[in-house]
Amino acid sequence: MPRLLIAASGTGGHIFPALSVAEELPESWDISWLGVPERLENQLVPTKYDMTVIPVGGLQSKGLRKYFQLLKLILAIFFVIYLIKRKQIKLVFTTGGYIAAPAIIASKLCGINVILHESNSYPGKVTRLLGKFCDEVALGLPIAAEKLKRCRTIVTGMPVRKSFSLKNPLPIWVPKGLEPLIVVMGGSQGAVGLNRMVRESLPWLLKQGYRVVHITGKYDKPSNINHKNFVEKSFTEEIPGLLQHADLAISRAGAGALSEFAICSLPVILVPYPYSSDHHQDANAAYAAQFGAALIVHEDRLGTHVLTRALENLLATNRMSSKYKSDDLLNKMRIGMTKLAIKDANQRLISILQRYV
């Protein structure tokens, strides 16, 4: 029986790819999960995977706190070594982030294989530092290989949930009508700044008759906007059906969201999170824009004005409820998104894992 330890923690961009792979592995695999206390994985990872949590954080702190974080990392490494031996783990799979550091180091000290998946176009710090110790580094976006020349890289694409490969109905709570449907997504970390920009653009959107679904994230207060063509939710599990029936998205530029838009061939206006580590969301957005798949609007004092103008340019001159014209910008963006998609990413990663057990 193959025994796999998955180390994935923090944001949806780390957790959802790992979950997507885990759910499609053969039932004969014994899967354990390594996470961090009070992080998103404690809510999302099914109970069928034995979850172990350990305190670990980044080393970017200063002063005494940096030494405290280093001590936590050392203790975490020893704990993962103990976990690997106790559970007789044969392979470790990680999606980067803080939890990847003790998982990778412990794996090498125990002499077992470790596979890392890097989703972003600009690799995270742990990937850049420890990727060379991994047996393979699977890439969500090919451009990431430029920063990982000492690593054994392979392009797999970004795994997405199996439900995205199915035809899903439009959620019943979405406003009904033939007018274009615009979906706003802030990502697992929420997006207070993005939400503000969108709310300031809403009067124009609703005046034009467009339908708007706004997924705000849990860290923002609900608005007081009441309109038949507007629905606001902090979270929904019906994202596949929502995106498959949408005409345009407005979103942060996380790698997970980009992969879902690509699978759905959904044009998007990207508003990169300005405080993302190493500005990786800016890099993700720029990569999507190279394919003509996205427009980029930055979150700054002019952001709302620029967002409204972008929406006007995309929507005002053509009604998306009719078929796309070949020369429409939205149609060109849809084609660009299709080129960005790697639809067999899940199977590519599973094939790699199966080679190492």
UniProtKB/Swiss-Prot annotation:
SUPFAM superfamilies: UDP-Glycosyltransferase/glycogen phosphorylase. InterPro entries: GlcNAc_MurG, Glyco_trans_28_C, GlycoTrans_28_N. It is found in: Cell inner membrane. The keyword Cell membrane applies. It is an enzyme of class 2 (transferase). Pathway: Cell wall biogenesis; peptidoglycan biosynthesis. It is a peripheral membrane protein. Gene3D superfamilies: Glycogen Phosphorylase B. GO terms for molecular function: UDP-N-acetyl-D-glucosamine:N-acetylmuramoyl-L-alanyl-D-glutamyl-meso-2,6-diaminopimelyl-D-alanyl-D-alanine-diphosphoundecaprenol 4-beta-N-acetylglucosaminlytransferase activity; undecaprenyldiphospho-muramoylpentapeptide beta-N-acetylglucosaminyltransferase activity. Its EC number is 2.4.1.227. Keywords: Cell cycle, Cell division, Cell inner membrane, Cell membrane, Cell shape, Cell wall biogenesis/degradation, Glycosyltransferase, Membrane, Peptidoglycan synthesis, Transferase. Belongs to the glycosyltransferase 28 family. MurG subfamily. This is UDP-N-acetylglucosamine--N-acetylmuramyl-(pentapeptide) pyrophosphoryl-undecaprenol N-acetylglucosamine transferase. The gene is murG.
